[in-house]
Swiss-Prot record:
Residue ranges with Polar residues bias: 86-100
Compositional bias of kind Basic residues: 63-81
Subunit structure: Interacts with RNF10. Interacts with TCF15.
Major location (coarse): nucleus
Phenotype caused by lack of the gene: Mice display defective differentiation and morphogenesis of the limb muscles, characterized by an overall reduction in muscle mass and elimination of specific muscles. Embryos also display a cleft palate phenotype at 15.5 dpc. Mice lacking Meox1 and Meox2 show extremely disrupted somite morphogenesis, patterning and differentiation. They lack an axial skeleton and skeletal muscles are severely deficient.
Protein's name according to its UniProt entry: Homeobox protein MOX-2
GO molecular function: DNA-binding transcription activator activity, RNA polymerase II-specific; DNA-binding transcription factor activity; RNA polymerase II cis-regulatory region sequence-specific DNA binding; sequence-specific DNA binding
Bias (Basic and acidic residues) ranges: 157-170, 182-191, 289-303
Residue ranges with Low complexity bias: 111-136
GO terms classed as biological process: angiogenesis; limb development; negative regulation of cell migration involved in sprouting angiogenesis; roof of mouth development; skeletal muscle tissue development; somite specification
Key word Ligase present: no
Gene expressing this chain: Meox2
Length: 303
C-alpha cells in the first residue's frame, strides 16, 4: 500500500481524500497547540502544498472549511487521530530523520524560482534554512553548493606551483639580503687634504720616497693627520711617480736621440754598434780589393 505522502510528491492532482489525514494534523497547528503529535509529517505535507500546483486555491479552501468543522466536532478529530495511528502501525513506516525532511523541503521550494537563472548570475545553492522545520541538525550538513564548473588541480601541478613560488621567494630573499649587505657596508670617505698639507707632503716626498715609522709619526702629528692617512698618501704618490717616470723616461730617451742625430753626436751604445758596423764594412772592402788584384794578375798571365 502506497503512502499518501509519496502520492502527493508524485501526482500534482492529488485528491482531498488522500490529504485528509495529514491536513487534519496540519490544521491542528492552527486550531490548538497541544495536538502536535506528528510535526515531521505535517511539515512534509505543508511543503507539498506550498509547491505551487494548479489545485492550490481549492486545497486552501477545503482546509479552511475543515478547520471550522474541526472546532465544532472535537471528538471527530480524536477519532481521526486514532485511525491515523492505527494506519501508521500497520504500514510500519520508518522514522524519518531531519535531514530527509530538509531535503524534501528544499526540493519543494525549488519550483518557486521564477524561470531559468541568468547566465551571469552566481551558481545556485541547493540549501534551505532547516531551522524553520524544528530540526536540531546544523544547516551546513544539508547544504550542497552548485559550483560544479571548477576543476580540481592535480597534485603534480600543485607541487610545481608551490616549488616555483618557493624558488622565487628564496631568490628574492637572497637578492634582498645581498642588497642589504651592500648598502649596510659604510663606504670609506675620501680624505680631503688641504693645500698646506699637500705642500708639506710633496716636499717630504721630494726628499724621501719612503718614510720610516718615526718620520711618518712626526708628519702625522705636524699635519694633524693619522699615520694611516700619511701612509696611504705616500703609497698613492709612489704609484703616480712610477707611472710618470716611465712615461718621462721613454719620452726623454726619444728626445735625446733626436737631439744627438741633429748634432751629430752619438751615444756610447750607438758608438759601439756603429764601430762594429764600420769594421765589418772595412773587412768587406779589403776582401773585395784582394779579389780584384787576383783577377788582374790572372789577366796579365794570360796575355
Amino acid at each position: 500500500m502506497e503512502h499518501p505522502l509519496f502520492g502527493c510528491l508524485r501526482s500534482p492532482h492529488a485528491t482531498a481524500q488522500g490529504l485528509h489525514p495529514f491536513s487534519q494534523s496540519s490544521l491542528a497547528l492552527h486550531g490548538r497547540s497541544d495536538h502536535m503529535s506528528y510535526p515531521e509529517l505535517s511539515t512534509s505535507s505543508s511543503s507539498c502544498i506550498i509547491a505551487g500546483y494548479p489545485n492550490e486555491e481549492g486545497m486552501f479552501a477545503s482546509q479552511h472549511h475543515r478547520g471550522h468543522h474541526h472546532h465544532h466536532h472535537h471528538h471527530h478529530h480524536h477519532h481521526q487521530q486514532q485511525q491515523h495511528q492505527a494506519l501508521q502501525s500497520n504500514w510500519h513506516l520508518p522514522q524519518m530523520s531531519s535531514p530527509p525532511s530538509a531535503a524534501r523541503h528544499s526540493l519543494c521550494l525549488q519550483p518557486d524560482s521564477g524561470g531559468p537563472p541568468e547566465l551571469g548570475s552566481s551558481p545556485p545553492v541547493l540549501c534551505s534554512n532547516s531551522s524553520s522545520l524544528g530540526s536540531s541538525t546544523p544547516t551546513g550538513a544539508a547544504c550542497a553548493p552548485g559550483d560544479y564548473g571548477r576543476q580540481a588541480l592535480s597534485p603534480a601541478d600543485v607541487e610545481k606551483r608551490s616549488g616555483s613560488k618557493r624558488k622565487s621567494d628564496s631568490s628574492d630573499s637572497q637578492e634582498g639580503n645581498y642588497k642589504s649587505e651592500v648598502n649596510s657596508k659604510p663606504r670609506k670617505e675620501r680624505t680631503a687634504f688641504t693645500k698646506e698639507q699637500i705642500r708639506e707632503l710633496e716636499a717630504e716626498f721630494a726628499h724621501h720616497n719612503y718614510l720610516t715609522r718615526l718620520r711618518r709619526y712626526e708628519i702625522a702629528v705636524n699635519l694633524d693627520l693619522t699615520e694611516r692617512q700619511v701612509k696611504v698618501w705616500f703609497q698613492n704618490r709612489r704609484m703616480k711617480w712610477k707611472r710618470v717616470k716611465g712615461g718621462q723616461q721613454g719620452a726623454a730617451a726619444r728626445e735625446k736621440e733626436l737631439v744627438n742625430v741633429k748634432k751629430g753626436t752619438l751615444l756610447p751604445s750607438e758608438l759601439s754598434g756603429i764601430g762594429a758596423a764600420t769594421l765589418q764594412q772595412t773587412g768587406d772592402s779589403l776582401a773585395n780589393e784582394d779579389s780584384r788584384d787576383s783577377d788582374h794578375s790572372s789577366e796579365h798571365a794570360h796575355l
